[in-house]
From Swiss-Prot:
Any Gene Ontology CC annotation: cytosol
A biological process term (GO) from this entry: TORC1 signaling
Gene symbol of the encoding locus: Lamtor5
Protein name: Ragulator complex protein LAMTOR5
Cellular compartment(s): Lysosome; Cytoplasm, Cytosol
Main location: other
Quaternary assembly: Homodimer. Part of the Ragulator complex composed of LAMTOR1, LAMTOR2, LAMTOR3, LAMTOR4 and LAMTOR5. LAMTOR4 and LAMTOR5 form a heterodimer that interacts, through LAMTOR1, with a LAMTOR2, LAMTOR3 heterodimer. The Ragulator complex interacts with both the mTORC1 complex and heterodimers constituted of the Rag GTPases RagA/RRAGA, RagB/RRAGB, RagC/RRAGC and RagD/RRAGD; regulated by amino acid availability. The Ragulator complex interacts with SLC38A9; the probable amino acid sensor.
Record-listed N-acetylmethionine modification sites: M1
Protein task: As part of the Ragulator complex it is involved in amino acid sensing and activation of mTORC1, a signaling complex promoting cell growth in response to growth factors, energy levels, and amino acids. Activated by amino acids through a mechanism involving the lysosomal V-ATPase, the Ragulator plays a dual role for the small GTPases Rag (RagA/RRAGA, RagB/RRAGB, RagC/RRAGC and/or RagD/RRAGD): it (1) acts as a guanine nucleotide exchange factor (GEF), activating the small GTPases Rag and (2) mediates recruitment of Rag GTPases to the lysosome membrane.
Taxonomic placement: Eukaryota, Metazoa, Chordata, Craniata, Vertebrata
Keyword Lipoprotein part of the UniProt annotation: no
Pfam family, one: LAMTOR5
Length: 91
């Protein structure tokens, strides 16, 4: 699985508008990251996804957390126990 995850991280970073990507487990353990998102962000990203999920009563509704700034967006979503964050530059 680790090699597959590493390949997905590399493939994601090939998009010129993406400057960072991070995958974390539900405990906030960094599973892999590239670019602007690093190990120090893993816990916060995991907690943001968990808290967003608590805002809905529908367990099939998987929220996307979007942090917006003048410099770009960080989109965070949890799937099957893995939370993915993508940092995309503003176009």
């Amino acid at each position: 699985m680790e090699a597959t995850l590493e390949q997905h991280l590399e493939d994601t970073m090939k998009n010129p508008s993406i400057v960072g990507v991070l995958c974390t487990d539900s405990q906030g353990l960094n599973l892999g990251c590239r670019g602007t998102l690093s190990d120090e962000h893993a816990g916060v990203i995991s907690v943001l996804a968990q808290q967003a999920a608590r805002l809905t009563s529908d367990p099939t509704d998987i929220p996307v957390v979007c942090l917006e700034s003048d410099n770009g967006n960080i989109m965070i979503q949890k799937h099957d126990g893995i939370t993915v964050a993508v940092h995309k530059m503003a176009s």
